Amino acid sequence: TCYEKDWTDGLPVVPPTEERVYRMLQGSSWEAAEVLGKMPPFNISATVEKVAINAVMAGCKPEFFPVVLTAVKAALDPGFCLHGLLATTWFSGTLCIVNGPVREAIGMNWQGNVLGQGNRANATIGRALQLAIRNIGGGKPRETDQSAFGSPAKVGFCFAEAVSYTHLRAH
């Protein structure tokens, strides 16, 4: 099972069958073999297909996949220092904030309880990023992830922002 192979964050996952991964790949125009970058800490090539496998396991819908790819690409930017995030003993994790028309198109929550339960897009996009870090790069607790306490963000931390609301804009 995925749990026995240490591919999960402790929560149940959707088995990444060939058919499910193929459907996930159809959610984006990127080629399956395209390399997004090297995933720390082991600096393994993060291909679109490998990210798709983790998006399936996280429970993402194919229409969420472009956001997942963008989040992974951003996390791999050297300026973000993903390796440092894994090497610290501090209780830090990744945060994915989504803006633009895609937030409505995929049904993200930006109106309240954005970090809470009940929204599949918010929950699974952040989880897909974390599973990719774990399964592609090797960022596993008590091994290469050195956080002393961990963080709920290491399960998934993603929401949409509401900058279009005029009452939230600075004047």
Regions picked out by a protein language model, each given a short descriptive name:
Residues 148-155:
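Beta-rich nucleic-acid/ligand-interaction surfaces
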Residues 89-103:
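Long, compositionally biased
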